[in-house]
């Protein structure tokens, strides 16, 4: 049996789940496995995977230009894109160590694309060139290539390669709020271990972007040239494309540099980015580069516990900048005050019922992302609370 579509149904109670599943079955879906419990910003939730062999008629509510919401098919091909740039360091990219689930929870969507960087769409897959528009999946084409760091339990024949990021899931949560004929184009520009006040500059080429050994942010440095170059390339793909937001998650490696200089250098980078986009203002949300929000995500509890004062110096500098259209999104805890899960093995357990294996299987430097396991958010956090809060912030401020 070959399945063509994968999705999930979420509900707050068994009766709500039954009603939602009944509707999905009428649309051509069928349950896949059994339901399990999870936790979101709204509290406990029941989640059921669903699959379909043929075409489905899943309706979604989209935001029209005026009037009531309209119900449309979720499988239409995009005619243009809302561009979302992803930049910063490791927690902004695919550093979730739990097993990727591309057939279910990390299933790509035909309306979500990315700008290519690597020579193939997936390892050993279809060839692509730098800045081509290609499908987006769980392990995006960032400056640092995470596609080679496979989970010990991965079945590569199922596409379970690499590590898990939040980019795809941010885009999935934005889709219901954009026009039916539009898609999301992700522009991945993150580099793990990068900082403003320490690190190597690396090199930059118009043909391939920043070199993988580039770990220094700053105005006109290779990582910046990569960021602005790929953003412009995404907009030039179609005059209808709109720059929707920049999602920025960075600061951890400035703990070991000169933290007091971080805020000024970040501010200068944002100013330069907006100035360099002045000639494309008509393709920016709000009609100007300054109208494009910078959504700045928090880090894990590990870094705050490591050095509280340095955490406040670096991450506190993202706060109280709403007048500059820079917005901080907290991730230290969930709505119940519980630490947001990380790659620490006890925070990322196996779920055998859905074929999920957590981070404990990455038990050496050959497979883990860092020996400080709590320094990065887990795969489930990226699928859930991280992407939930980032997508909400984009919709609120764009």
Q: What do these predicted ranges mean?
A:
Residues 62-398:
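Cell-envelope and extracellular/periplasmic
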Residues 1-65:
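Terminus-proximal functional modules
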């Amino acid at each position: 049996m070959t399945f063509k579509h994968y999705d999930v149904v979420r509900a707050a109670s068994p009766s709500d789940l039954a009603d939602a599943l009944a509707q999905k079955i009428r649309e051509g879906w069928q349950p896949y496995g059994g339901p399990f419990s999870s936790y979101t910003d709204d509290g406990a939730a029941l989640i059921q995977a669903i699959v379909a062999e043929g075409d489905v008629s899943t309706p979604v509510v989209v935001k029209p230009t005026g009037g009531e919401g309209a119900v449309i098919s979720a499988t239409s091909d995009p005619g243009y894109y809302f561009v979302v740039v992803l930049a910063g360091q490791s927690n902004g990219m695919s550093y979730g160590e739990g097993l990727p689930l591309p057939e279910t929870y990390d299933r790509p969507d035909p309306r979500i694309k990315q700008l290519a960087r690597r020579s193939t769409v997936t390892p050993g897959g279809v060839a692509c060139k730098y800045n081509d528009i290609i499908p987006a999946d769980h392990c995006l084409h960032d400056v640092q290539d995470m596609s080679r760091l496979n989970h010990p339990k991965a079945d590569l024949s199922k596409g379970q390669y690499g590590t898990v990021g939040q980019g795809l899931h941010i885009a999935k949560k934005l889709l219901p709020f954009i026009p039916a004929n539009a898609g999301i184009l992700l522009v991945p520009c993150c580099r793990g271990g990068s900082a403003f006040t320490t690190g190597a500059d690396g090199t930059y080429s118009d043909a391939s972007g920043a070199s993988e050994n580039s770990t220094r942010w700053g105005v006109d440095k290779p990582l910046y040239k990569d960021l602005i170059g790929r953003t412009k390339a995404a907009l030039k793909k179609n005059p209808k494309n709109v720059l929707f937001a920049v999602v920025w998650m960075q600061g951890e490696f400035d703990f070991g540099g000169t933290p007091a200089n971080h805020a000024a250098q970040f501010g200068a980078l944002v100013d330069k980015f907006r100035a360099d986009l002045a000639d494309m203002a008509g393709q920016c949300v709000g009609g100007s580069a300054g109208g494009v929000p910078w959504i700045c995500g928090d880090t894990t509890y590990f870094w705050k516990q490591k050095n509280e004062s340095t955490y406040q110096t670096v991450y506190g500098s993202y706060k109280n900048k709403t007048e500059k259209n820079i917005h901080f999104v907290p991730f230290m805890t969930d709505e119940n005050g519980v630490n947001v899960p990380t790659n620490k093995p006890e925070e990322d357990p196996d779920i055998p019922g859905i074929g999920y294996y957590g981070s404990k299987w990455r038990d050496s430097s050959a497979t883990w992302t860092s020996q400080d396991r709590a320094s990065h958010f887990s795969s489930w956090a990226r699928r859930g609370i991280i992407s939930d809060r980032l997508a909400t912030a984009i919709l609120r401020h764009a």
